[in-house]
Curated annotation (Swiss-Prot):
Organism: Corynebacterium pseudotuberculosis (strain 1002)
SUPFAM superfamilies cross-referenced by the UniProt entry: (Trans)glycosidases
Transition state stabilizer (site feature) positions: 467
CDD domains attached to this UniProt entry: AmyAc_GlgE_like (cd11344)
Protein keywords: Carbohydrate metabolism, Glycosyltransferase, Transferase
Record-given protein name: Alpha-1,4-glucan:maltose-1-phosphate maltosyltransferase
Pfam family of the protein (one): GLGE_C
Active site residues of this protein: 382 (nucleophile), 411 (proton donor)
The reaction(s) this protein catalyses: alpha-maltose 1-phosphate + [(1->4)-alpha-D-glucosyl](n) = [(1->4)-alpha-D-glucosyl](n+2) + phosphate
Family matches, as HAMAP family: GlgE
């Protein structure tokens, strides 16, 4: 406590206030604080919001919906940049007076008993009028006059206790013992940092086959043609694994073989050869000019190109000749290759960020700025948790000084301390453990956690990756692909699909492995998407439906507000999402069993969707268009042979109830 009144536990407050919390333009940001004082006099608080240009707005806070010890409000930023907010506490003499007068009248005290109270009230209303507009001031002076009049007691106080005057005082409070809090920061990014649908493909696999049926190496030109299908499915970010020259020394062969054949293309993550390094493109893909044309084509289709930022090098990367101090040099004079004992990665040299810090920092900044100059504003960062956190904090903040639109996604499958730590130092998005959350209880815990951590980290839920083919997809049949897509597309506003998912690719390299057989990481994998679609053997239409629903419904574009509802079947999960800005509301009910039909009674927590327990309403299934009557307890049946999920449009939440729905019990960000 630093002032006359106590202001504690202000949220959001990240890393002790040393890091900004996260938000995007148009998002409702809930703010809370514990405000208290001695005795029985009422206290209140003001939320002061300072925009990046210095414009200040002030809002009187209210008691939190489910925690009367906390004061609560919110704001919606409308511009990029660093915003600030401050909670000021103050004694609320008007509320104290109001409470005392009502209590005294209720026990039978008369005008004489209340003489001092009435005069004190009149003075308070005159004070409130000092900073009000002329029409409002006239109303407040009239209340003061009424309190001093000779009318019967209840008539004298009626104007002071009216709803209209109460609302006026909320906007024009009398503040005493004002105690200023500390400033806290919020980094506001563009909406794409929070809401986007990603599709991953290897440009080199877009070349099709030759007349003998052999794969042909793709180019940026063939990739541009492939983007039309991606855009038609409703994806808005297309992510390419590294597009740079691939090392030839210790090149990996098919299925991660240590011995490469003459025509093996190697792993794109083994970056660098005689043809160049991180600022070059693979010669077989085309030229830098061809890449620029690809970016332009993507933009015309409504797609952003995301590039892989893999900070490592092949043994024949130019750095290995010109900057050996970027690496760890062993006693025998050789450069240390990557190891994760007992695994060895002879085709990759990891960087040593402690050898020549200034040079390596400058070089990596140059590379990022180089690709920004080519039109890239989204980067998927490979294994950032294996590089120093202070490097990322420096790089991201430095890039954002001149390019605040740039988005960094952390590909970090790691423990919470690292995962959330990367969010704190600046990453806009992160991969998560969604892939391994398959049961109802696991998904409910996961969904609750990602919403609670929205001020720190934004989860991008990929249903598969070139590295990860989960056993549920290997053995769950085609319905499981739809189930996982429905979960990913609705649990988080960020989700992603790696190419081949829509073709139900499910064959692992071996039993108990999550690696794909004939992994695209090591060979060309052209696919005939058109034939599969024509044969009805493709998930493309369903993916397109999911993305269309997401674009149409703000409830699925926000992360903070999600509530899980009770069902009496462990195979049926139900959750609602509400956008507190627009009031848009969605209910999702999914059968988690890909092989059997299941039924359940869904027991809604009605206030979580802005309804009363007695309400009845009609919902529309946004997948099928069917309509159903709905109430607090409703029977559902889902057969994976027909529909794995209901995605239901609920009645729009009344405006007066929306802000309260954004309240969440503050989370401990220390983990």
């Amino acid at each position: 406590m630093t002032g006359r009144l106590a202001i504690e536990d202000v949220r959001p407050r990240i890393a002790g206030g040393s890091q900004p919390s996260k938000a995007v333009i148009g998002e409702m940001i809930p703010v809370s604080a514990l405000v208290w004082r001695e005795g029985h006099d009422a206290v209140s608080a003001t939320l002061n919001v300072i925009s990046p240009t210095g414009e200040v707005t002030r809002t009187t806070m209210e008691p939190a919906p489910f925690d009367q010890d906390k004061m609560f409000s919110s704001f919606v930023p409308d511009a990029l940049g660093t915003w600030k907010f401050r909670v000021d506490a103050w004694s609320d003499p008007m509320s104290t007076w109001r409470h005392a007068v009502i209590a005294k009248i209720e026990v039978g005290q008369d005008e004489d008993d209340l003489f001092n109270d009435l005069e004190h009230g009149a003075q308070l209303f005159e004070k409130a009028a000092e900073n009000a507009s002329k029409p409002t001031a006239q109303k407040l002076f009239a209340v003061a006059d009424s309190l001093r009049s000779n009318q019967p007691l209840r008539a004298r106080v009626a104007p002071a206790l009216s709803k209209e005057i109460h609302e006026i005082l909320h906007e024009h409070p009398v503040r005493e013992l004002l105690t200023r809090g500390q400033n806290h920061t919020v980094l506001v990014e563009r909406k794409k940092a929070q809401f986007s649908s990603w599709y991953e493909l290897f440009p080199r696999s877009t070349g099709g086959w030759d007349t003998d049926g052999n794969p042909v190496h793709g180019t940026f030109s063939t990739t541009a043609k492939a983007l039309k299908r991606v855009a038609a499915m409703g994806f808005d970010t297309v992510y390419f694994p590294p597009i740079h020259p691939i090392g030839e020394i210790h090149r990996k062969g098919k299925n991660n073989s240590l011995i490469a054949e003459a025509n093996d293309v190697g792993s794109p993550w083994a970056i660098g050869s005689a043809a160049g390094g991180h600022d070059a493109v693979h010669p077989q893909l085309g030229t830098l000019k061809d890449f620029q044309a690809l970016v332009s084509t993507a933009e015309e289709l409504g797609l952003s190109v995301a590039l892989d930022l893999a900070l490592q090098a092949a043994p024949d990367h130019p750095w290995a000749r010109t900057h050996q101090d970027f690496f760890t040099v062993l006693a025998d004079g050789t450069i240390a290759y990557a190891e994760n004992p007992p695994k060895k990665y002879q085709d990759i040299y990891p960087l040593n960020f402690d050898n020549n810090k200034s040079a390596i920092y400058a070089e990596l900044k140059r590379i990022v700025l180089f690709w920004i100059a080519q039109g890239v504003t989204v980067f998927r960062v490979d294994n950032p948790h294996t590089k120093p956190a202070n490097f990322w904090e420096w790089l991201i903040s430095t890039i954002h000084e001149t390019h605040p639109e740039v988005i960094f996604l952390a590909e970090a499958f790691t423990r919470p301390a690292r995962l959330y730590g990367l969010g704190k130092v600046g990453f806009s998005q992160s991969y998560t453990y969604f892939t391994w959350r398959t049961t109802k209880s696991e998904l409910e815990e996961f969904g609750t956690e990602i919403a609670a951590m929205a001020d720190v980290s934004r989860p991008n839920l990929f249903v598969n990756t070139p590295d990860i083919l989960h056993e549920s997809l290997q053995h769950g049949g085609r319905a499981m692909f739809a189930i996982r897509a429905a979960l990913a597309a609705t649990l988080s506003p960020l989700w992603g699909v790696y190419s081949g998912f829509e073709l139900y690719e499910n064959e692992a390299v071996s039993a108990n492995s999550e690696e794909y057989l004939d992994s695209e990481k090591y060979e060309l994998r052209p696919r005939d998407f058109t034939a599969a679609l024509e044969q009805g053997d493709s998930l493309e239409p369903y993916l397109g439906t999911l993305n269309a629903i997401r674009r149409a419904h703000p409830a699925l574009q926000q992360l903070r507000v999600i509530d899980f509802h009770s069902t009496d079947n462990e195979n049926i999960i139900a959750y609602s999402k509400v956008d507190p800005v627009s009031g848009d509301a969605i209910l999702v009910v999914i059968n988690l069993d890909p092989t059997h039909a299941h039924s359940a009674t869904v027991d809604l927590t009605m206030n979580a969707i802005g309804c009363e327990d007695v309400d009845h309403f009609t919902v529309t299934d946004l997948v099928t268009g069917a309509q159903f009557p709905w109430n607090k307890r409703t029977y559902v049946r889902l057969d994976p042979c027909a529909d794995v999920a209901h995605i239901l449009e609920l009645p729009v939440v009344e405006e007066s109830k929306r802000k309260a729905l954004s309240w969440r019990t503050p989370t401990d960000y220390s983990n």
